[in-house]
């Protein structure tokens, strides 16, 4: 047995499923997960000492590359002053101010420790602000593992959802309406039937949890118009897309001003840090100013804030996003060309430093489209690349990520490996 196998067996004896987040278990693709020993730049090394070019990027946060020396130094300096205080720090103010400069929709902001906390609290805040209970989410969008958001579509077009996890009471989900992404007619019908009862609409503005799905321009326009008309709060869940698809997030690309925004991943630079923010009148409903309660012992942790501030500084440097976008487009175009040459049904898409790979004729517009893609083909591709030293997320439903550490030459090397894998798949 190799080290990965030994560690997985050992982990399963004490950690449920052997992992601390389900996708890491390789359940969707089969095989043994790689236990990572270290990471630097665009690479990770497993416990066997095998090096992989990494397109997981810690599921998005590693936008400047792993263990960036400036980020590490900022964290080291912060750690010398103490690890956690349970009291306010100047760094919390600075990072909130910097985010507000980048995202004009954020008039007030609060730090938390995870994306789940951010979305859970944003939903609670929207309900408290509006005095309404019902929420709209979209099938295939993931917003963390809080109870009201672990909901899948009901049996009818506009029936309320069913729990997507054991342990979530069915009665608890009666206020959550699950609609099809990019379906304007469903959205209009939902507001026509229940508009005065809807507290908020939450969505991933580019969906990263059914690979990469783009919203249509008409869809985001309808979202903004309908929520404004009916007094519902529009929540952009930018935990994944914030500072990843563009400096100003998806909202800057859409030209949309959401009422609330949730963010995470990149803003922590690889450390546990997230936030929610938006309109002043809504945000001032949160305690201690208002009656909507939220708290956290480690919210605004000084080490995480230091990592986040340095990451935000780096990504604001001239040419950062132009280069990141160009490298990501180079990758997906190379994959498309390689698959076409091998006669494999495949397409790919990207926005900023985020990309999606689909074993289908066309990029998906919603969850049903993604579910019809060739998942078995993805599994073969995933293992073919992994065996040759290229790591993608172990699920056909997860987006991939490029960092500033991925050079054009490294992208070319990855594409060359993909050429081999596509040829082998076609044989």
UniProtKB/Swiss-Prot annotation:
Q: Which positions does the record annotate as the modified residue N6-(pyridoxal phosphate)lysine? A: 265
Q: Which UniProt keywords apply?
A: Cytoplasm, Isomerase, Porphyrin biosynthesis, Pyridoxal phosphate
> In the Enzyme Commission scheme, what number(s) does this protein have?
5.4.3.8
Keyword Isomerase appears in the UniProt entry: yes
Which subcellular locations apply to this protein? Answer: Cytoplasm
- Please state what class of enzyme this protein is: isomerase
| Annotated metabolic or biological route of this protein | Porphyrin-containing compound metabolism; protoporphyrin-IX biosynthesis; 5-aminolevulinate from L-glutamyl-tRNA(Glu): step 2/2
A Gene Ontology cellular-component term: cytoplasm
SUPFAM superfamilies given in the database record: PLP-dependent transferases (SSF53383)
Pfam family of this protein, just one?
Aminotran_3
Cofactors (names)? pyridoxal 5'-phosphate
Asked whether the keyword NADP is assigned, the reply is no
Tell me the GO BP annotations in alphabetical order: protoporphyrinogen IX biosynthetic process
Catalytic activity, as annotated: (S)-4-amino-5-oxopentanoate = 5-aminolevulinate
Q: Which GO terms describe its molecular function?
A: glutamate-1-semialdehyde 2,1-aminomutase activity; pyridoxal phosphate binding; transaminase activity
Task: Check the record and name the CDD domains matching this protein.
Answer: OAT_like (cd00610)
Q: Which family does it belong to?
A: Belongs to the class-III pyridoxal-phosphate-dependent aminotransferase family. HemL subfamily.
On assembly, the entry states: Homodimer.
Protein name per Swiss-Prot or TrEMBL: Glutamate-1-semialdehyde 2,1-aminomutase
Q: Tell me the organism.
A: Neisseria meningitidis serogroup C / serotype 2a (strain ATCC 700532 / DSM 15464 / FAM18)
């Amino acid at each position: 047995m190799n080290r990965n196998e030994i560690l997985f067996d050992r982990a399963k004896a004490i950690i449920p499923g052997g992992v601390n987040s389900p996708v890491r278990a390789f359940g969707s693709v089969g095989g043994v997960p790689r236990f990572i020993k270290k990471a630097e730049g665009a690479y990770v090394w497993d416990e066997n000492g095998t090096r992989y070019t990494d397109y997981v990027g810690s599921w998005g946060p590693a936008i400047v590359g792993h263990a960036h020396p400036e980020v590490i130094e900022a964290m080291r300096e912060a750690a010398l002053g103490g690890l956690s205080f349970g009291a306010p720090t100047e760094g919390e103010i600075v990072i909130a101010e910097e985010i507000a400069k980048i995202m004009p929709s954020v008039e007030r902001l609060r730090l938390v420790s995870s994306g789940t906390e951010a979305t859970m609290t944003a939903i609670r805040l929207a309900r408290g602000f509006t005095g309404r209970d019902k929420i709209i989410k979209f099938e295939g969008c993931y917003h963390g593992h809080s109870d009201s958001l672990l909901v899948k579509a009901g049996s009818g077009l506009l029936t309320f959802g069913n729990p997507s996890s054991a342990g979530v009471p069915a009665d608890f989900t009666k206020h959550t309406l699950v609609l099809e992404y990019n379906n304007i007619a469903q959205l209009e019908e939902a507001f026509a039937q229940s508009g005065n009862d809807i507290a908020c609409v939450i969505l991933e503005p580019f969906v990263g949890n059914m690979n990469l799905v783009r919203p249509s321009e008409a869809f985001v326009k309808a979202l903004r118009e309908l929520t404004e008309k009916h007094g519902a709060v529009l929540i952009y869940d930018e935990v994944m897309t914030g500072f990843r698809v563009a400096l100003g997030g998806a909202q800057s690309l859409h030209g949309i001003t959401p009422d609330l925004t949730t963010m995470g991943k990149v803003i922590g630079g690889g450390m546990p840090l997230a936030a929610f923010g938006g309109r002043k009148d809504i945000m001032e409903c949160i305690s201690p100013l208002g009656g909507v309660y939220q708290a956290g012992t480690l919210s605004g942790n000084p080490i995480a804030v230091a990592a986040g501030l340095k990451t935000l500084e780096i990504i604001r440097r001239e040419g950062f996003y132009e280069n990141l976008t160009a490298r990501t487009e180079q990758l997906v175009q190379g994959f498309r060309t390689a698959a076409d040459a091998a006669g494999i049904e495949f397409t790919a898409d990207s926005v900023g430093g985020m990309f999606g790979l689909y074993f289908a004729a066309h990029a998906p517009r919603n969850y049903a489209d993604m579910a019809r893609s060739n998942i078995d083909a993805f599994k073969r591709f995933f293992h073919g690349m992994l065996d040759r030293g290229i790591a993608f997320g172990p699920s056909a439903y997860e987006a991939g990520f490029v960092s500033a550490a991925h050079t054009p030459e490294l992208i070319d090397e990855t594409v060359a490996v993909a050429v081999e894998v596509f040829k082998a798949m076609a044989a």
